[in-house]
Amino acid sequence: MDLSNLKAAEGSVHSDNFRRGRGHGSGNGKTAGKGHKGQKARSGAPRPGFEGGQMPLYRRLPKRGFKNRNTLTIVPINLSALERFDNDAVVSVETLIEAGIVKNPRDGVKILGNGELTKKLTVQANAFSASAKEKIEALGGKAEVI
């Protein structure tokens, strides 16, 4: 060890910010680098969204609508998507979730008549279009509203 590779002991060197406001000799006494008076010299910060007394944006804009948390989201499913089920199968919301057609178990299901159906199925859904119901029943299946 010599004078060219001296190092301070670990933990002994601190940032100057730890010693603010500790007398004139420090160069950061009295106002501790905050300047004189005024909003920025005070403790605490204004709350988010405060615009210095000007009418804030969230009060200048009109209130408009809301999102109803109890609304049932209806997922439309075409008859062509039901082709993957076996003949005489019962197609319910649970089986549609297992097949990956419906993602959220809280969603409702409406069966639409787009595409062709070639299998006899018992389909349980929240709603059916007229053409879908007609096509399901034409093959001897059932369209049950749950």
Swiss-Prot record:
It comes from the Bacteria. InterPro entries: Ribosomal_uL15, Ribosomal_uL15/eL18, Ribosomal_uL15/eL18_sf, Ribosomal_uL15_bac-type, Ribosomal_uL15_CS. NCBIfam families: rplO_bact. The gene is rplO. Belongs to the universal ribosomal protein uL15 family. Part of the 50S ribosomal subunit. Binds to the 23S rRNA. One of its GO terms (cellular component) is cytosolic large ribosomal subunit. HAMAP family: Ribosomal_uL15. Residues 1-57 are annotated as: Disordered. Keywords: Ribonucleoprotein, Ribosomal protein, RNA-binding, rRNA-binding. One of its GO terms (molecular function) is rRNA binding. This is Large ribosomal subunit protein uL15. GO terms for biological process: translation.
